[in-house]
């Protein structure tokens, strides 16, 4: 029985991968005077922390100041591109109805995201997340977490639910693996990367969905 739900955010509740790619493209043009290739994107950018991406683009010559500056600039571009594309600037279909269903069932839920605080604040304000969950319970990249496993464990503590009794909703292979390693055995995958067959074979995965209407 599910006693708590932990959502990843980017690619799970909000489809935004193209905005991240566009933002890194803008930074790449500043740093290297060229765009990112598809090969680079898959090898050096997808699922990689900002710091490592910036080091890659600076040929491992980036200072701490460089990393801080360009990381913040990338996220600023990202938020700008999100706001400019109003047609896609919304949560995945069925999200709010699923939140309401969980509320009605008195099942607590929160978010565990690798996003930085500025982006979390942006999401809370833009999507009115404070109406649905305690903002203080949202887990984000505050610089203290070693990995997403630690984030999931902390999110379960915030909900006051054993992680074995939590449902985790993810969208990436690494996120699914981290959820399983954290102790979760009930993982739902949002198929934003169109990789259903592979996800269905992964340990802990109980369902693969395209949007949250499938859970209502």
Where does each model-flagged region fall?
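Conserved phosphate-coupling serine/threonine residues in phosphotransfer and NTP-handling enzymes
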Residues: 12, 113-115
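Short, acidic loop-to-helix structural element flanking the phosphoryl-transfer center
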Residues: 80-111, 149
């Amino acid at each position: 029985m599910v006693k708590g739900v932990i959502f990843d955010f980017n690619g799970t509740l909000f489809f935004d991968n193209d905005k991240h790619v566009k933002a890194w493209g803008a930074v790449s043009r500043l740093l290297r005077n060229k765009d990112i290739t598809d090969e680079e994107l898959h090898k050096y950018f997808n699922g990689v922390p900002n710091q490592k991406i910036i080091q890659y683009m600076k040929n491992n010559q980036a200072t701490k100041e460089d990393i801080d500056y360009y990381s913040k600039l990338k996220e600023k571009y990202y938020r700008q591109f999100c706001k400019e594309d109003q047609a896609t600037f919304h949560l995945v279909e069925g999200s709010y109805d699923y939140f309401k269903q969980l509320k009605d069932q008195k099942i607590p839920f929160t978010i565990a995201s690798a996003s930085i605080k500025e982006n979390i604040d942006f999401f809370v304000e833009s999507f009115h997340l404070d109406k649905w969950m305690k903002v203080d319970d949202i887990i984000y990249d505050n610089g203290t977490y070693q990995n997403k496993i630690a984030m999931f464990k902390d999110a379960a503590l915030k909900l006051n639910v054993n992680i074995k009794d939590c449902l985790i909703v993810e969208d990436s292979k690494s996120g699914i693996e981290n959820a399983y390693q954290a102790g979760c055995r009930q993982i739902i995958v949002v198929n934003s990367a169109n990789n259903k067959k592979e996800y269905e074979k992964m340990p802990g995965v109980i369902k693969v969905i395209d949007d949250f209407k499938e859970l209502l």
